[in-house]
Amino acid sequence: MAELKNDRYLRALLKQPVDMTPVWMMRQAGRYLPEYKATRAQAGDFMSLCKNHELACEVTLQPLRRYELDAAILFSDILTVPDAMGLGLYFEAGEGPRFERPTDTIDAIKKLSIPDPEDELGYVMKAVSTIRRELNGQVPLIGFSGSPWTLATYMVEGGSSKTFEKIKKMAYAEPAALHMLLDKLADSVTLYLNAQVANGAQSLMIFDSWGGALSHTAYREFSLRYMQKIVDGLTRFADGRQVPVTLFTKGGGLWLEAMAETGCDALGLDWTVDIADARRRVGHKVALQGNMDPSMLYAPIPRIEEEVGQILAGYGEGTGHVFNLGHGIHQHVDPEHAGAFIKAVHAQSKQYHK
């Protein structure tokens, strides 16, 4: 593997000194870029794009050609794991992901097998190894998965949900069934992420997109407990250096201390959290990633630059901050505004790293 030319992102996650704050964007390979839309049209549909390792590599690299980003993130989807479990993933126009065979009964859960990441998910591993090779040491490659709770919401609900009625009914009326599902998912995700590291991922992120839908105690029981199980089982050293792990619960500002206790290296923050407060609470234990409101990218460029300055000042001096949005970039954002955001982070952050 080529030697890493820019390791700023990995160093910040491990709270090692950096010359400026590293930056990348969730969904940086996505629909706001015209070149992404062209490649997706070439693939035919979203899952065909994910399953073609050459095209998945192409869209992963597209934002790096435009912007001076400090990391690449594998182009894939969190629902690859349940899809590999045989649920029949498909996408309804305007409705998002759906499953032909939801796992909403204990019998369905018992029948689920844990997918072999090199077999049923081999197309993801081929994409990881292709991207790592093509990056040629330019920046680190982030691998990722959804959290067990978040994957389970789609599997039990049969797709996206605003109320989470079915999975919450299972959580409170049939907790043993849900725990069986979450346990299988934790094992599946651990294998999946370790296979990504074996194929070239240099950092890992667990996206708990729907953890914030849970009550204070239910979050620990149904989400955090299973992310902890994954963190305990991950490969944390490869290619002669540490493989940092970031946990991100959207709506998880209440639970930063508990998340920091898992042994992860960093926490992702959504835009509702005050980064200065987060650093006071958990900055002695973990690095922090975030956390500009993605909608701020619709603002005039001077306002974006002002917001970047406020977040950098909120975090303050020293390492341990990876700048990002508080969630994925919106599809209608002007690519020039995204570029101005990235430049502003680099230009304004040097003063905090003297």
From Swiss-Prot:
InterPro entries: UROD/MetE-like_sf, Uroporphyrinogen_deCO2ase_HemE, Uroporphyrinogen_deCOase. This is Uroporphyrinogen decarboxylase. GO terms for biological process: heme biosynthetic process; protoporphyrinogen IX biosynthetic process from glutamate. It catalyses: uroporphyrinogen III + 4 H(+) = coproporphyrinogen III + 4 CO2. The record marks 77 as: Transition state stabilizer. It is an enzyme of class 4 (lyase). PANTHER family: METHYLTETRAHYDROFOLATE:HOMOCYSTEINE METHYLTRANSFERASE RELATED, UROPORPHYRINOGEN DECARBOXYLASE.
